[in-house]
């Protein structure tokens, strides 16, 4: 299926923001790489900030669609395992998006959408820890989310899948009862 110019701009911006960073990527470069005029970028997105917002929103829509099946699991142990598997699965499917997010980690736009996405995952995890009888399910959820964040960063910056998988299996074993 042919991409619209608007979609091409988004895809190109994502790649360049992931490679060079948001601040180091002028809209003129996005236009050149996408094969469109810079004016067309502003016609569709008005500003570079709005373009970034659109790239982040589109990325989280894709991530949400891809991860839905992982967090509807009723078995609490399987849910925890699914959440632990998310960094591997989602980074492999959306490497550029997560590379961009890694660069934008301190930006409000990135934090806002990441919190919105992770909130529902955290609610599901808290329910899983309650089902398993943990004394402090909220804290267990925070700890697990910190582990997931660390796994995400590790896999994003180090593509040694074997080492990553060993760590992942070790963490999963700690949650099996």
Language model: regions and residue ranges:
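Hydrophobic alpha-helical connector segments
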Residues: 54, 68-93, 144
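Short, basic, alpha-helical segments at the C-terminal edge of helix-turn-helix-like DNA-binding modules
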Residues: 57-62
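Short secondary-structure transition hinges
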Residues: 86-127, 153
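Hydrophobic alpha-helical segments that form the core
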Residues: 135-159, 164-174
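N-terminal intrinsically disordered/low-complexity leader segments
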Residues: 1-4
């Amino acid at each position: 299926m042919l991409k619209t110019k608007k979609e091409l701009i988004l895809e190109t911006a994502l790649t360049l923001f992931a490679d060079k960073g948001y601040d180091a990527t002028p809209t003129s470069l996005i236009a050149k790489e996408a094969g469109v005029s810079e004016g067309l970028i502003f016609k569709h997105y008005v500003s570079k900030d709005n373009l970034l917002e659109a790239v982040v929103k589109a990325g989280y829509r894709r991530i949400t669609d891809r991860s839905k099946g992982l967090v509807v699991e009723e078995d609490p142990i399987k849910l925890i395992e699914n959440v632990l598997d998310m960094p591997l699965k989602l980074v492999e499917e959306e490497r550029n998006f997560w590379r961009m997010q890694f660069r934008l980690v301190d930006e409000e736009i990135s934090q806002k959408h990441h919190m919105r996405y992770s909130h529902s995952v955290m609610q599901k995890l808290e329910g899983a820890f309650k089902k398993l009888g943990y004394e402090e399910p909220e804290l267990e959820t925070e700890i697990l989310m910190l582990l997931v964040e660390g796994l995400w960063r590790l896999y994003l910056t180090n593509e040694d899948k074997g080492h990553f998988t060993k760590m992942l299996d070790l963490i999963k074993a700690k949650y099996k009862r």
